Structure formats: C-alpha cells, structure tokens
Amino acid sequence: MSDVEEQYQEEQQPVVQEELQVVELATTIPLDVQEAQREVKLFNKWSFEDVEVKDVSLVDYIQIRNPVFVSHTAGKYASKRFRKAQCPIVERLTNSLMMNGRNNGKKLKAVRIVKHALEIIHVLTEQNPIQVVVDAIVNSGAREDSTRIGSSGTVRRQAVDVSPLRRVNQAIALLTIGAREASFRNIKTIAECLAEELINAAKGSSTSYAIKKKDELERVAKSNR
C-alpha cells in the first residue's frame, strides 16, 4: 500500500466514526419525537395535515396547504392583487383583528389574541382549532348578495352571486367584527369572545354574529331576485 493510500485512509477514518455516532444518536431518539420535529405546527401545537375545506369552491382560497409556525409573513402577500388568497388563513384572521382604529399595527397583540382563542377552542371542543376556524369561515360567507343597478334617476337592487374570494373576505370580517363588538364593555376578553364566535359559526348556530349577518344578506338578495 502506498503512502498516499495510507494517508487517505487515515483522513477518512474520523469521518466514518462521526457518521457512526450520528447514526447511533438517530436510532436512540424515538420515532414519534423525530416525526414531531419534522412536522410544522401552528404555534408548535396544532397540525395542518388533517384540516380539510368542506366547500369545494373555497379550496383554492382558504390556504392551509403551506403550514407555518407563526401567523406572520411580514406582508409578502400584499404586494400584488389577489395574492392574499395565498396567505395562510390564520394569518388573515389575525390581520383582520387589527382593522379597528386603536388596534392598527398591533400585530403581536393580535397574534396573542388568536393563539389564546385557539387554545380555548381546543379545550372546549377537543378538536383541532384550525379545522374549527376553517369551518367557521366556510359557514359565514354569504353565497348571494344584492347590488345597486341603474343611474341616479332609477335605481334598483339586483341579486348577484358572490365570488369565492369575497366570500372568504366577508366571512373573516364578520367574524372579527362580531368578536370585537361582543367584547366591548364586557367582562369577557376578546380572545374568549373570538373563540365563542368561531365555535358558534362552525356549528352554524344563529347566536353567531357572522351567521346572523350572512342570513340577513341572503334574505335581502332573495327578495331582490
């Protein structure tokens, strides 16, 4: 054996030993722990894998395919029109909580509210709270609305179908408005009111502010057909 081959084997020996140590370490870690480390969970608690959108028309507009740890992407979906449809749905709910004047720009506060609300939902329903949020948004979007047609002289209202993106936008807005109004001058926190609103909307209950508004919009549209 030449000197070059001996030197090459001496250099490769510590590398092989390190690889063996890594393999031994990997085999000592339980499989469930390894899988949990690989999976991306919201707030490192809830998985996106089993979440499904039950309305076929909204599958492309409720983003749950790309999981995130925290509902904050620094506004990269606001640069182009209609790109917000690709924004994670929990982040869209978080951003909608900042719409009121005194809450403008308080993203960290909104993230904490949503996290606390999801924890409450998980305790009360024993379900994946992301699935509850998706069901609430699907149930809260009006399928039919009315619009004004005509000039200033003769104006009439005509029933029209609502696009899927507007359904999602309207549902998120109604859910957050209902939670904000319920928490105003109330002993309950806004996180508790948001959790209650999402649970009732996911069930389709008429006690939900968003469901009541949706039914009202559809009733007016039906009378203007």
UniProtKB/Swiss-Prot annotation:
Record-given protein name: Small ribosomal subunit protein uS7
Top-level taxon of origin: Eukaryota
SUPFAM superfamilies to which the protein is assigned, alphabetical: Ribosomal protein S7
The protein's assembly and partners: Component of the small ribosomal subunit. Mature ribosomes consist of a small (40S) and a large (60S) subunit. The 40S subunit contains about 32 different proteins and 1 molecule of RNA (18S). The 60S subunit contains 45 different proteins and 3 molecules of RNA (25S, 5.8S and 5S).
Gene Ontology cellular component annotations, sorted alphabetically: cytosolic small ribosomal subunit; membrane; ribosome
GO molecular function: mRNA binding; rRNA binding; structural constituent of ribosome
Keywords carried by this UniProt record: Cytoplasm, Ribonucleoprotein, Ribosomal protein
Physiological role: Component of the ribosome, a large ribonucleoprotein complex responsible for the synthesis of proteins in the cell. The small ribosomal subunit (SSU) binds messenger RNAs (mRNAs) and translates the encoded message by selecting cognate aminoacyl-transfer RNA (tRNA) molecules. The large subunit (LSU) contains the ribosomal catalytic site termed the peptidyl transferase center (PTC), which catalyzes the formation of peptide bonds, thereby polymerizing the amino acids delivered by tRNAs into a polypeptide chain.
GO BP: any one term: ribosomal small subunit assembly
Entry-linked PROSITE patterns: RIBOSOMAL_S7
Similarity comment text for this entry: Belongs to the universal ribosomal protein uS7 family.
Source species: Candida albicans (strain SC5314 / ATCC MYA-2876) (Yeast)
Localization: Cytoplasm
